[in-house]
Amino acid sequence: MTDTAPIRVLIVDDHAVVRTGLKVFLDLQPDMEVVGEAADGSEGVAMARRLEPDVVLMDLLMPNMDGVTAIGRIKSERPETEIVTMTSFIEEEKVTSALEAGASGYVLKDAEAEEVAAAVRAAYAGEVHLDPAVARLLAQRMRDRKSPKDELAEPLTEREKDVLRLLGQGMSNKDIGATLFITERTARTYVSNILGKLGLASRTQAALFAVEHKLVDAPG
């Protein structure tokens, strides 16, 4: 056990074998504790409300309530809870819907167990964690998208560009603040300003915008 409280994880997946495997592995991590398991989105929302997890590992295709709907419900009730989606496929509509609903990470079910743990830790730290194939898909989608925001009516300041560049590297507000020698609260304000100017809805979209505009290297 670490000196700090472990990351409280809720697993939501309709396959019992997946839930069991994830629980066994995550409970072996010194900084994690699986506090609950749910078999569908509706149960997941109820358990998130009751257990108040730090991070939810969420399947997307489930009976009663799908993962995207559950993500939206959980984030509306508990915005501080981070959500990482886990699926066995990459479908653009599902990926974008999950991220727009509030997910901060996306990993595939065939990923190495260590990658799943890394995604949980990244989400807990306020960072973005995307499977490389998912990041490439979304970056390509942004390249194909034609939007008035491609030519910024309200250009970013140099400091905002610095923050956006660090967002593109997946940094949390705390890490951005430490890197730029500003407070975490100031970093959060910069992020909010950037999202507003670019017409983006989330840190994930901002990170992909940074990749598209070559502020950081494109993933794999």
Report the location of each language-model feature.
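The feature encodes the CheY-like receiver
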Residues: 18, 63
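Acidic catalytic/metal-coordinating carboxylates
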Residues: 40-43, 64-69
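Active-site residues of response regulator receiver
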Residues: 13, 59, 87
